[in-house]
Amino acid sequence: TDYNIVLLPHVLMPADNDLDILETIAHEKKNERIRLLFEHLSAAEYKYVISKAELCIAARTHVTIAAYSSCVPTLAIGYSTKAKGIADDLNLEEYVIDVEEDKLQQKLEEQFLKLYKNKRQLKEQLKGKIPQYIQNATPQKLLDFLKEDMR
């Protein structure tokens, strides 16, 4: 690919550590276009990095949410029903791959090419859907409180 690739660990727990697999990928590929970003970033900084991506491939729900809410076309690797449910809400269900999928690597490659091909359309689709999605997800009482606080 001609893309620069940022590997961004999200979960760093002893029993469930993204850094382990991402270090393995970065080491095996030995490509200067692949960068493992492992600085202690705040949630806002992580979201900023994700928002600057042209495309996103993610297996963590919070990463997909950060990408979707930043209108970044995303291929979600789902390990739970949450990935499919969120994508369904945005009419992006065809861009979710079950981690248990047969021929996972082949499916990832096919879906990535589809994501790449349709990236402009998907970005516009997200721009059209995300504001309403956020409004629907935010309780009206909170919105009213925030409006009051801003006066």
Predicted regions mapped to residue ranges:
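Active-site anion-handling motifs in enzyme catalytic cores
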Residues: T1-R151
